[in-house]
Amino acid sequence: MEEFKINLERDRSQQHDFIYPLIFQEYIYAFAHDRGLKRSIFLENAGYDNKSSLLIVKRLITHLITQIYQQNHFLFSVNDSKQNKIFGYNTHFYSQRIFEGFAIVVEIPFYLRLVSFLEDKERVKSQNLGSIHSIFPFLEDQFSHLNYVLDILIPHPIHLEILVQTLRYWVKDASSLHLLRFFLYDYPILNSLIIPKKSSFSISKINQRFFLFLYNFHVWEYESIFVFLRTQSSHLRLISSETFLERISFYQKIELEVFTNEFKAILWDFKEPFMHYVRYRGKAILASKGTSLLMNKWKYYLVNFWQCYFYMWSQPKRICINQLSNHSLDFMSYLSSVRLQLLMVRSKMIENSFLIENASKKFDTLMPITPMIGYLSKAKFCNVLGHPVSKPVWADLSDSDIIDRFGRIYRNISHYHSGSLKKTSLYRIKYILRLSCARTLARKHKSTVRAFLKRLGVGLLEEFFTEEEQVFYLTFPKVSSTSGKLYRRKIWYLDIICINDLANYE
């Protein structure tokens, strides 16, 4: 990683901040290939195998540019990889290398700005800020004091050129943008990667990181309006309203185009000190302590703002206004709600005693069992009714590998849903996976489940499925309560950066 930074700084100093020449640097593809294998940005070693050849990548880019001028384009086909070869090499494989390298190159300006910003502000970089669970403690602290919430399904761009135009404000290198346009326009398979679905968008596994970067950057651009309104409508500049990446050009664009004559009126309408915004993937939540009239103003303002200035078509029905007191939020695989908790207090004055009823709001999070059963059913661990079935595709593995896979899946689910107030749903998931594991082992040994468990003992499976529960004792070593009371606690882990996909175990 340090060698990568040194080479990057040297190349940037020689090229005067032009990122296009970085595409032809060998260490970029070595870093991209190794990061793709380990799925981590912070690497110690940037090794790569002999399949990634810088010479072939350079030849492929040269051939692509030649095709642009000759207007004799060819296609990268996933299903017909044998026919699409240049210089005897598979073009689809090296197009993947180019996209991975290009994704790193376009991330460089933002990474350097982030590093410089953190150094100027003297802020401590913490991996906990990237945890998915870090959102829920924030919701617990803030949402219990709010009244209304907007459930927002973020619209998708109607054309990939919009993503390039948004990126143009940050990347001043015209050559890189032209190459990006060529990738997006010349290959129909890439133009169909972003497909609108029921709730948000779907991106193919091909070049997923590259297109997620473009989409997230596009969403981050219009999210800057919340920071802008918050800063302009506050008398005191709060630290919490500062952005990690300052965007001078975006602020100028807002001042000149969006808020020309009606800026003061908009600030008057949206001046709300208790506005909170949370987003994950294609869904966002905007909560406020204001009235329903204020939330309606926000709703139609967002729709018009997306359509007029970011060319994203959004319908008002994709934004729902709900009252937190009688609505459950379906967000990040949790059902969250704010319920009224009554507390009876007995007070005694001299000879008279009376009861005082205190009401307080509490933020609850529950694990929805129905979507999880559907997820397990799709992964062939049970049927649609939740009855466990065997996993035939794993029958060829060793017994230890089968048990380890089932145990790892349960520990991942239990680890992520440890913040659920009630653990009944986790008990059912544990039952499904344990019985599915037993049936898979019995199928392998051509025996019944009862005979197999009688021969090896139930403790063999229990050892793998109870490892996660020991974490609770390590988290609260001084608590002297029973295991049942301890297991009902809500625990948020700050080391979860993604939701594990059960399909990855196929």
UniProtKB/Swiss-Prot annotation:
Q: Where in the cell is it found?
A: Plastid, Chloroplast
Do you know which Pfam families this protein is assigned to? Intron_maturas2, MatK_N
Give the record's keywords alphabetically: Chloroplast, mRNA processing, Plastid, RNA-binding, tRNA processing
- Is the RNA-binding keyword given for this protein? yes
Q: Which GO terms describe its cellular component?
A: chloroplast
Q: Which GO terms describe its biological process?
A: mRNA processing; RNA splicing; tRNA processing
GO MF annotations for this entry? RNA binding
Manganese as a keyword of this entry, yes or no, is no
Function comment: Usually encoded in the trnK tRNA gene intron. Probably assists in splicing its own and other chloroplast group II introns.
According to its UniProt record, which protein family does this protein belong to? Belongs to the intron maturase 2 family. MatK subfamily.
Q: What is this protein called?
A: Maturase K
Q: Which organism is it from?
A: Calluna vulgaris (Heather)
Task: Please name the taxonomic classification of the source.
Answer: Eukaryota, Viridiplantae, Streptophyta, Embryophyta, Tracheophyta
Encoded by which gene? matK
